[in-house]
Amino acid sequence: MRRLILAVVVAGLALAVAACGSSNKSSSNTAAATGAPPAASSKPGAGKPAVTLGDKNFTEQFILGQLYKQALEAKGYTVNLKANIGSSELIDKSLTSGQIDLYPEYTGVILSELAHQTKRPADADAAYQAAKTFEEGRGFTLLDKTPFFDTDALAVLPAYAQKNNLKTVADLAKLPAGSVTVGAPPEFATRFEGLKGLKSEYGLTLKLKPLTIGLQYKALDTNKVDTADVFTTDGQLQGSKYTVLTDPKNVFGFQNVAPIVSQKVLDAQGPAFAQTLNAVSAKLNDEAMRKMNAAVDLDKQDPAKVAQQFLAANGLA
């Protein structure tokens, strides 16, 4: 009886193994017949060449670099980030020499500092189109611009503004020439969006105190400077601690952000690459950018963490 039971079990196992083999063979034959490839990652960036993303040397750029990097990585792209490269003049050399493939830039800066155009476009759209045309002439292109724009501006303490009746940049001309000290990065001395433009458009002769970006507010607070070059999306400007002078002659231009990308890289990465970056840019309005800048500058949060939280909240990572 035991032999009979054993024989039945062995026969059953043999049939099961044969069935599995037949099933696997059938599946293989079906795949071969249809030409279906083996299962692969559904992420559009899987298997694409790695890209190198750069950013400049201040808080907003650190956040933008992380936003674009993490969004691309969520889609399967491999991204190497070169952070804190420096000013536009420096990072542009990294781009044109092939050290980086893309970076976020301000449209007005492209026109004034890279294309060396001093004629101001009529509006933000005109500035974007002119900047895009310039970049396409160099083998690059601009992706979509952000809703927010972050322009340079001159800020003063409210007491200083009240004492000297200052509301606009033009009002500084009422003060004795050379009596006003401005705190700004070293490149402010040679930029049209700096001493050159302020002189030609407003007739201002300002003394420059070179400062690393981020130290201008402390210099204002301690009366080391009378006015400072600031960015309009700085977290420090959320309250009423500082007065920002308006720029009626638009020396500081229109400054929406758009990624500059090598056209060769776009071609190699496929349409989802640009779509991913554009989806991030579309969410970056003035309020969102000010909040993220404040989180880093005032609350001392890590830019990578701030970017991660924003992307998650907006369904982008």
Segments the model singles out, each with a brief description of its role:
Residues M1-A18:
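Sec-dependent bacterial lipoprotein signal peptides
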Residues A16-A32:
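Bacterial lipoprotein signal-peptidase II cleavage site
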Residues G35, A40-Q66, A83-S88, E187-T190:
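Extracytoplasmic "Venus flytrap"
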Residues L81-K93, K207-K218:
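Short helix-initiation/N-cap motifs at beta->coil->alpha
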Residues L114-A122, Y128-L143, K224-T227, Q236-N250:
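Ligand-binding "clamshell"
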Residues A124-T181, Q263, A282-D286:
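A conserved helix-loop-strand patch within extracytoplasmic ligand-binding domains
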Residues G139-F140, T146-A153, T233-S281:
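Periplasmic-binding protein-like
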